[in-house]
Curated annotation (Swiss-Prot):
This is Arginine--tRNA ligase. The lineage of its organism: Archaea, Methanobacteriati, Methanobacteriota, Methanomada group, Methanococci. PANTHER family: ARGININE--TRNA LIGASE, CYTOPLASMIC (PTHR11956:SF5), ARGINYL-TRNA SYNTHETASE (PTHR11956). Keywords: Aminoacyl-tRNA synthetase, ATP-binding, Cytoplasm, Ligase, Nucleotide-binding, Protein biosynthesis. GO terms for molecular function: arginine-tRNA ligase activity; ATP binding. One of its GO terms (biological process) is arginyl-tRNA aminoacylation. Pfam families: Arg_tRNA_synt_N, DALR_1, tRNA-synt_1d. The keyword tRNA processing does not apply. A motif ('HIGH' region) lies at residues 121-131. PROSITE patterns: AA_TRNA_LIGASE_I. It comes from Methanococcus maripaludis (strain C7 / ATCC BAA-1331). Signal peptide: none annotated. CDD domains: ArgRS_core.
Length: 566
């Protein structure tokens, strides 16, 4: 029984009965459960039409309603408050979670294909925490969209044709790769040293341009030669390191799509031709696409006069490929890419394609300052994770919950992944953020350890329960802590639906923290194993069991595992 929707439907019918008109109705949740479970202000909205005071209207409506699952309706100062029958509601919620287990929170299949592109960092050095924000938000959004019923394919767009990769290929001829280091870090060192070389000798820039031109010509001609092999090997080597980092954070892409694929297939050349045929291309040292019909003053650079393509052209070809293979596409991009993203989307519209949705994220930094890949001053995701794991291991040792160094390592890794992923995803992408250790590894208030610790508490309680009985559950007057946690648990499906609909994984992150905090209050105020009344004891054991399942299901949506012990 969906009590919230039942209230809304009943109120809509009542409004139509009173006015003859339909009204969009939204329910609020009072700040405290003793004030009701749901509340509406429709009396204020009806006052003008009915020519009555809101207080009178509220009392009339409250006295006339009879809603299944609602045991009391109160009119207070013009507001109408609804109180649920928690005995019935709790039985139904517990039964549903137990029946659905790991599927609780998942919605029906929608039969819509989504291509979600995220991370897509250039293969010229290790991921920094800016890339980390992209990958964590992207992977969390993928999991949420899948749970909400979409068929989702995640893609990583590999930039193998840009200047950065040409610098790596050039640098590999000048400097020896340090094979003792992780692949992407070794490539990053070559990239930094090569940039220093280029800064000292500007004449070398022509060699970089020649590499780019020769590689594109070989790709366009479908030729595989020594140069194409050098590019392929350099990119593959870096991607090997990338995949290690992604895997550590429980992130896996379905497909790695290389930029050069669209040059080799002739698609880039076809895109340029189609855009030339629109009559919107002007020649001005380069070929530029006029998008002023879409309100854009700046023109999109399509190609050089020598015919070689640019990143933007190849990006358009990639997006056309996406649009032809999905119902809708979602991209994760830094806020500094907003103009480029709009220009690509308007170009797609010009050619008759749907535009891609874009989730933009703002800058992320550490308290120590900002990052710069080119000069070699940045904090890599690998370093961030190792620091998180080291700090987590220290805390695990302090608490004395592990029996060996191997177990400390295993628990610390899961805490570290949770700390990094949760601390990033809980902040709205559009807000700049500073990654702070005291928040990421907070065991008391806002960190993922709070959630993982609540799960460990559930596990410890259930270890001492031989049989979980579902007989006569909640046949007593429940207290506020019990009501609050049961109501929170019931919300997961709607949370998933909302987060997927608005593409905001932080909704799930905030919800799971609410569940953990709600459970901690329940734990502190409601004895479970020591409760003497068997019906109350069984009901509370059911709450613990359900909380454990919901915490697992919800953190799985964020790519986070449970350590078990904390």
């Amino acid at each position: 029984m969906d009590v919230e929707n039942l209230i809304i439907t009943t109120l809509k019918d009542k409004v139509e009965e009173l006015t003859g008109n339909e009204m969009d109705i939204r329910l609020d949740e009072p700040p405290a459960i003793n004030m009701g479970d749901y509340s509406t202000n429709i009396s204020f909205r009806l006052a003008k039409d009915l020519k009555k005071a809101p207080k009178v209207i509220a009392e009339d409506i409250a006295n006339s309603l009879n809603i299944s699952g609602i045991e009391k309706i109160e009119a207070v100062n013009g507001y109408i408050n609804f109180f649920m029958n928690y005995s019935d509601f709790s039985k139904e919620t517990v039964s549903k979670i137990i029946d659905e287990k790991e599927n609780f929170g998942k919605l029906e299949k929608r039969h819509e294909k989504v291509i979600l592109e995220h991370t897509s960092a250039n293969p010229n050095g290790p991921f920094h925490i800016g890339h980390g924000r992209n990958m964590v938000i992207g992977d969390s959004l993928k999991r949420i969209l899948v749970a909400s019923g979409y068929d989702v394919e995640t893609q990583y767009y590999v930039n193998d044709m840009g200047r950065q990769e040409a610098i790596v290929v050039f640098g590999n001829e000048k400097f020896e790769l340090d094979k003792s280091k992780k692949a992407d870090h070794a490539i990053g060192e070559v990239y930094v040293e090569t940039n220093k070389l280029l800064a000292e000798n500007e004449e070398l820039e022509q060699e970089i341009l020649n590499l780019m031109k020769n590689y594109e010509e070989a790709c366009e001609a479908g030729i595989e030669n020594e140069l194409t092999e050098k590019f392929k090997n350099a990119v593959d080597y870096s991607l090997g390191g990338f995949k290690e980092t992604l895997s550590t954070l429980n992130i896996y892409h379905d497909k790695f799509v290389w930029e050069s694929e669209f040059v080799k297939s002739g698609m880039v050349r076809e895109v340029i031709k189609r855009l030339m045929d629109t009559g919107k291309v002007v020649e001005d040292e380069v070929f530029r696409l006029d998008l002023s019909d879409y309100g854009l003053e700046k023109k999109l650079v399509l190609a050089r006069l020598n015919g070689t393509s640019l990143y933007s052209t190849r990006d358009i070809a990639y997006h056309i490929n996406k649009m032809e293979n999905c119902d809708f596409a979602v991209n994760l991009l830094g806020a500094d890419h907003k103009l480029t993203a709009v220009m690509v989307n308007k170009t797609l519209a010009l050619l008759g394609y749907n535009e891609a949705e874009v989730v933009f994220y703002e800058f992320i930094s550490l308290p120590e300052g900002s990052m710069s890949t080119r000069r070699g001053r940045f904090i890599s995701m690998d370093e961030l994770f190792e620091e998180a794991k080291s700090r987590a291991a220290e805390e695990v040792r302090k608490r004395g919950v592990a029996e060996s160094e191997e177990e400390i390592e295993e628990i610390a890794k899961k805490i570290a992944v949770g700390a990094v992923r949760y601390n990033i995803v809980r902040i709205a992408p559009e807000k700049p953020m500073v990654f702070r250790w005291d928040e990421a590894l907070d065991f008391e208030k806002v960190g993922c350890p709070v959630i993982q610790y609540a799960h460990a508490r559930c596990s410890r309680i259930l270890e001492n329960v031989e049989i979980i009985s579902n007989d006569n559950l909640f046949a007593y007057e429940m207290n506020e802590n019990e009501k609050t946690i049961v109501k929170l648990l019931s919300k997961l499906p709607k949370i998933v639906e909302k987060a997927a609909e608005v593409r905001k994984p932080q909704i799930v992150a905030n919800y799971v923290l609410d569940v953990a905090q709600g459970f901690n209050k329940f734990y502190a105020n409601c004895p479970v194993l020591k409760e003497e009344n068997q019906i109350i004891k069984n009901s509370r054991i059911a709450i613990v069991n359900n909380t454990k399942m919901v915490l697992e299901n919800t953190l799985d949506l964020l790519g986070i595992e449970m350590p078990g012990k904390m």
